[in-house]
Regions:
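General beta-strand structural signal in soluble alpha/beta enzymes
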Residues: 68, 144-148, 195-199
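Rossmann-fold NAD(P)-binding glycine/threonine-rich loop
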Residues: 103-106, 110-162
Length: 229
């Protein structure tokens, strides 16, 4: 019931053009870049990390819509939560915050299993369990997860947002129609074109180094995704 209430609140906010509160779990390069775009689009954002004091410079430069806090504070704050952490830390987030995340309207999973950081055995295990997406759903039971922004470099986001001409496409994967709709709206607001490539099982393809990695138009993403099913 709480999750439905959250989704109803978000639906009303989007219908009336009201901002959504967004919590960023992991305000490193990717989380910081995405959060910055959301602030510039008019949404209040709480950035979080293990050491929120280190985020003072980031939030000071973004003005009154940005604040820093702990991971728990960012999750409590957000109608929408963006998780941009080393993938090996996802289990820890699930153990501590799965209940709270299940009550959100949308959880955007930006995290990727990367061998050089998380270890080759860990990445192999994620693959054997169906890949990122299905594993995130297992670790965050009940959360309305959409994988997105998994394969565009953080340093490129600001320059690609709202680019002239055809927008850059962002492949997304999810199983919750309402969460997908919220994600699509937010992605368009910050200057990209969302492309639903399938359910969370397709999340295994939304990582760097795959055909869907890198920068593509929406039409190119649809063509590539069609060859992967």
């Amino acid at each position: 019931m709480v999750a439905l209430a959250a989704q109803s609140h978000v639906a009303v906010a989007q219908a009336t053009g009201s901002p959504l509160k967004i919590g960023i779990v992991g305000a490193g390069r990717e989380g910081g870049a995405l959060g910055t775009l959301f602030v510039k689009a008019g949404h209040p954002v709480t950035f979080s990390s293990r050491h929120p004091d280190n985020l003072k410079g980031l939030v000071a430069g973004l003005g009154p819509l940005a604040q820093a806090g702990t991971v728990a504070e960012a999750i409590a704050f957000g109608d929408v939560v963006v998780i941009a952490i080393p993938y090996a830390a996802m289990e820890e987030i699930g153990k501590a915050h799965a209940g709270a995340l299940a009550k959100k309207a949308l959880v955007i999973d930006v995290s990727n299993p990367i061998a050089r950081r998380d270890g080759e055995d860990f990445v192999k295990s994620v693959g054997e369990q169906g890949g990122a997406g299905l594993v995130t759903a297992k670790l965050l039971p009940g959360a309305p997860i959409v994988r997105a922004f998994n394969a565009i470099g953080s340093g490129r986001l600001a320059g690609l947002a709202h680019r002239a001409g055809e927008p850059v496409g962002v492949p997304i994967a999810g199983d919750d129609p309402k969460a997908i709709a919220v994600a699509q709206s937010l992605i368009r607001e910050i200057g990209f074109e969302p492309v639903l490539v399938g359910g969370l099982a397709m999340g295994r393809h939304l990582v760097p180094g795959t055909p869907l990695g890198g920068e593509h138009t929406a039409a190119e993403i649809r063509q590539i995704a069609g060859s992967l099913h």
